[in-house]
């Protein structure tokens, strides 16, 4: 067994970062600690964002140039030399006042799309207004404007065609100043969705609002159509302004576990054949026969070339998926998807992929592709597939080991770039690697040794052909953004080092972060602790478990954060710990699939066991142990408190699930199967919070929910409240009027964290 790594964030400054091997953390003696007159990180600091972490959000526009917004000017940078020029003046944005929310440059750099009047809908979806700016004429285009309340808009990958969705129908502009061509006419609110996702596809499958995909040179536009006829509606009141005499009612087609699901169709239209005099009929591509035997999902779309596309389909029981590779026949003008180009992915122990099957990355000639799948030991690794599937053909794994590839970032003719957690055998780390395609033993970590104390958790943004890349070091030290050249990995320049924040934090007593593991049943389970300043292992501290614990989640990592836990540790001297038990991700399917078909069991037990293990470390006050979580974390919090373990004094559940039959079909059935007697109904019924109501008499409980939560409906907390009242349990509750799942409006955000802080102060007798 190798020595565990324990990561500390001293004062959070670059020079103060320390990586150690043994507990305790670096300590000051009692006199030095008492003499530390610096202020702490307060609740007001968190709520007002007093200390701002800077990032560097660039947008690549070629293999050697990127755009960056600075002082409201859009600057064009040369990656190699760092020189810049003004691409778009701030005066252009000033025309719209403060209403500009985003911009998008056409691939040929002739036009800029300006977004304003942004109105949020669900997690990813929104409506907005758009104007097109002509860069050659340096003026806005006033002809044939895009309608207000557009739901989605996107440039083609070459040139400057535009596709957009308005009132659930798709339109295409061949030229920005010319009239739009209407592609569909079947769109209907809450019923037929063309080119955009319905609620459940947006939230659980694509993680986006768009269901449009341009081909590489912009000839073809692919799109999905979702039909929610028959999908039951969730409805809730929206109270709005107090002058509204009757509340509004919001309706959303929302399939719950076992309910009628949306159906999906897939089409491709040739935009080069669009004209004002003839009608172009989109061509439909049907799902493979092996998934159309029952309910199924479209779960991935990827263009391979101008006349080849790959589609991934998934059965409703999400342990079987098929990738179909389809080719365009220029003679018959149809799309063919031969069974010899179908690739099947299955899971015998759980579900396909982490949340869905991973996307493929095709070689430039389209003859093969690389994809992250589980190897024979259950670890997610990169495998190479040939386009044409032969009987009994097995893909070739190019990575292997008891660690996981997180994502494929780029594929060139010579190398594949990916992020993994291999380094130091630390699941909560992230580093960038490249591997040679012709020699898989030629693998190199591009980030591991750059700044190993400050940087153990990286993200990357590569240029169009991966000639340059931006590394984003996100922890454990202050975030650092640098630009590199791929040929020799040379660092060309520092883009942002957060030195100003580093200087400010030198005057604040900041907590430290410890990342370590415990061994249970011969398996490593990782945890993190946010420890108070001047932590003294001979003292007893209150402990708050910060839990999520959903399938494929990870809370123990090497990332840097300034959040509520920073305040609790710095000012209130509370240890805030998170533990990744069974069901968590990035450590192999054995751990992740352990909770398959039994949510609310092992992941709940593991949080209780983690608290017991922390108590054994000697510095936790056994009479002051609490737990809190949001969403799935709220469910686990409630199940833990309702277990009657005697370990926890109090807890906070925000927007919790309470019964899995109340949650959406795609997420719930992925892990639980169907709520039918033939499948898994018994466990659906045995995993409710309400069934544990009697045990809440032993704990202090704060239940919180937003009344306009479109995701985890207020119904979930309402049923917990009803069960607790029926059981005669005294508890606290807080609702937030018209707030959704994030409870993120300015006033509600401040109120909820103030309220939760007061609850913990009372529970831990801190005031």
Curated annotation (Swiss-Prot):
Glycans are attached at residues 83, 90, 148, 217, 227, 319, 521, 686. It catalyses: Release of an N-terminal dipeptide, Xaa-Yaa-|-Zaa-, from a polypeptide, preferentially when Yaa is Pro, provided Zaa is neither Pro nor hydroxyproline. It is found in: Cell membrane; Apical cell membrane; Cell projection, Invadopodium membrane; Cell projection, Lamellipodium membrane. Residues 1-6 are cytoplasmic. GO terms for biological process: B-1a B cell differentiation; behavioral fear response; cell adhesion; endothelial cell migration; locomotory exploration behavior; negative regulation of extracellular matrix disassembly; negative regulation of neutrophil chemotaxis; positive regulation of cell population proliferation. Residues 29-767 are extracellular. InterPro entries: AB_hydrolase_fold, DPPIV_rep, Pept_S9_AS, Peptidase_S9_cat, Peptidase_S9B_N, Serine_Prot_S9B/DPPIV. The soluble form (Dipeptidyl peptidase 4 soluble form also named SDPP) derives from the membrane form (Dipeptidyl peptidase 4 membrane form also named MDPP) by proteolytic processing. Expressed in bile ducts and other epithelial brush borders (small intestine, kidney, colon, pancreatic duct); acinar structures in salivary glands; endothelial structures and T cell areas in thymus, spleen and lymph node. Inhibited by GPC3 and diprotin A. Changing residue 632 to F: No effect on activity. The chain crosses the membrane at residues 7-28. The active site is at residues 631, 709, 741. The keyword Disulfide bond applies. Pfam families: DPPIV_N, DPPIV_rep, Peptidase_S9. Changing residue 633 to S: Reduced activity. Disulfide bonds join 326-337, 383-395, 445-448, 455-473, 650-763. Its main location: membrane. Its EC number is 3.4.14.5. It is an enzyme of class 3 (hydrolase). GO terms for molecular function: aminopeptidase activity; chemorepellent activity; collagen binding; dipeptidyl-peptidase activity; identical protein binding; peptide binding; protease binding; protein homodimerization activity. PANTHER family: DIPEPTIDYL PEPTIDASE 4, PROTEASE FAMILY S9B,C DIPEPTIDYL-PEPTIDASE IV-RELATED. Monomer. Homodimer. Heterodimer with Seprase (FAP). Requires homodimerization for optimal dipeptidyl peptidase activity and T-cell costimulation. Found in a membrane raft complex, at least composed of BCL10, CARD11, DPP4 and IKBKB. Associates with collagen. Interacts with PTPRC; the interaction is enhanced in an interleukin-12-dependent manner in activated lymphocytes. Interacts (via extracellular domain) with ADA; does not inhibit its dipeptidyl peptidase activity. Interacts with CAV1 (via the N-terminus); the interaction is direct. Belongs to the peptidase S9B family. DPPIV subfamily. This is Dipeptidyl peptidase 4. It comes from Rattus norvegicus (Rat).
